[in-house]
């Protein structure tokens, strides 16, 4: 994996016996020795988990009119939020497909920090840079910041133990300091639990990681890899780009229309998305809950009770909370909530009930 990039915490992961694998061009921990996906998942649901997600992209858009420019490109409406708030948004292509889903941190009208997915950072930066007007700069800051996600019921206690603010509203952020070092603290996450995402400077990330674990000894704090991150987000029905969202899957199909500023005059993909919304999508993202032992996996075909093909699984896993197989699938427009469908599991039908996620209660706010 010599061609893969590494986070500033690579050495910490190796010391913890992490199983490392490539993800989005980065060598990242999937699970940790002596723990595993199940225990790490349960730590987040019951106590607190600490994730290294420093592989996530970062890009800064600065200059006079920076926020206005971002708003004319990305799907959501920055006019809905004030400085000090973050917003989930989409970078779409002309056909309405999703090039990436990302978080926009609005500092001011002259500064927006974007956090794309790792594999798509360069493309998002290139698209924005090519469209930027005079006076607006788009700077790749992929290795300018680390990202630590602290998630779970005990997350506020742990973050507060470091002297960092914890009382902000959901999706709000502050520029704080820890031991004189700058760190952005945002009330957000990808797990459905109360949580925070901390963005220290890249080189400060190991020290902050160590401090979190030192303070978390009595709280049941656990390192959490990308394996449990996937089971946690799937239980919430949160989409993953490259599976549930992609350049050929639109926000209308993926039920992400809430992240589109439909009243805006300009954003990439606007005409195609307005047309699709008016006509109705040919397929929609649904949840699948196994009624037997089958576990849905990406790309498995889905058929109706009569055997007719109706779609394909986009995400699937075993739910540690529910102890059953769950998944997300793009299904034909005629499929409805409560329908029984079958997933082709190595040539055998796996019965599933069509449901609306989340699969378990969410408490992020």
Swiss-Prot record:
Listed Pfam families: GCV_T, GCV_T_C
UniProt keyword annotations, A-Z: Aminotransferase, Transferase
Enzyme Commission designation: 2.1.2.10
Annotated S-S bridges: none
GO biological process: glycine decarboxylation via glycine cleavage system
GO molecular function, one term: transaminase activity
UniProt catalytic activity: N(6)-[(R)-S(8)-aminomethyldihydrolipoyl]-L-lysyl-[protein] + (6S)-5,6,7,8-tetrahydrofolate = N(6)-[(R)-dihydrolipoyl]-L-lysyl-[protein] + (6R)-5,10-methylene-5,6,7,8-tetrahydrofolate + NH4(+)
Entry GO CC: cytosol; glycine cleavage complex
Origin: domain of life: Bacteria
Function of the protein: The glycine cleavage system catalyzes the degradation of glycine.
Entry-linked PANTHER family: AMINOMETHYLTRANSFERASE (PTHR43757), AMINOMETHYLTRANSFERASE, MITOCHONDRIAL (PTHR43757:SF2)
Family: Belongs to the GcvT family.
Summary of subunit composition and partner proteins: The glycine cleavage system is composed of four proteins: P, T, L and H.
The protein, known as: Aminomethyltransferase
Origin species: Frankia alni (strain DSM 45986 / CECT 9034 / ACN14a)
């Amino acid at each position: 994996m010599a061609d893969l990039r590494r986070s500033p915490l690579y050495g910490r992961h190796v010391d913890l016996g992490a199983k490392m694998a490539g993800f989005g061009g980065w060598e990242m921990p999937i699970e940790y020795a002596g723990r595993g996906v199940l225990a790490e998942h349960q730590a987040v649901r019951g106590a607190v988990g600490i994730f290294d997600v420093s592989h996530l992209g970062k890009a800064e858009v600065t200059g006079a009119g920076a926020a206005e420019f971002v708003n004319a490109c990305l799907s959501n409406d920055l006019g809905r939020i004030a400085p000090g708030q973050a917003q989930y948004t989409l970078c779409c292509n002309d056909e309405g497909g999703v090039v990436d889903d990302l978080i926009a941190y609005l500092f001011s009208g002259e500064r927006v920090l974007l956090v794309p997915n790792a594999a798509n950072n360069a493309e998002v930066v290139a698209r924005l840079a090519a469209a930027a007007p005079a006076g607006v700069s788009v700077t790749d800051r992929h290795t300018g910041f680390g990202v630590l996600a602290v998630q779970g019921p005990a997350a506020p206690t742990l973050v507060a133990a470091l002297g960092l603010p914890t009382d902000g509203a959901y999706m709000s952020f502050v520029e704080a300091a820890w031991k004189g070092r700058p760190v952005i603290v945002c009330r957000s996450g990808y797990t459905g639990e109360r949580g925070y995402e901390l963005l220290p400077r890249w080189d400060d990330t190991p020290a902050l990681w160590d401090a979190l674990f030192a303070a978390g000894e009595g709280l049941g704090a656990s390192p959490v890899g990308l394996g449990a991150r996937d089971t946690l987000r799937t239980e919430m029905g949160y989409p993953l780009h490259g599976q549930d969202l992609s350049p050929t899957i639109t926000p209308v199909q993926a039920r992400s229309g809430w992240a589109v500023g439909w009243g805006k005059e300009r954003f990439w993909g606007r005409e195609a998305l307005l047309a699709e919304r008016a006509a109705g999508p040919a397929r929609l993202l649904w949840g699948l809950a196994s009624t037997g032992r089958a576990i849905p996996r990406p790309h498995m075909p889905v058929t109706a009770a009569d055997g007719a093909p109706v779609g394909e699984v986009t995400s699937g896993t075993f739910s540690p909370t529910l102890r059953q197989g769950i998944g997300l699938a793009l299904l034909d427009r005629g499929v409805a909530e409560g329908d029984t469908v079958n997933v082709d599991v190595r040539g055998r039908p796996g019965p599933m009930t069509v449901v609306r996620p989340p699969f378990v209660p969410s408490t992020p706010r």
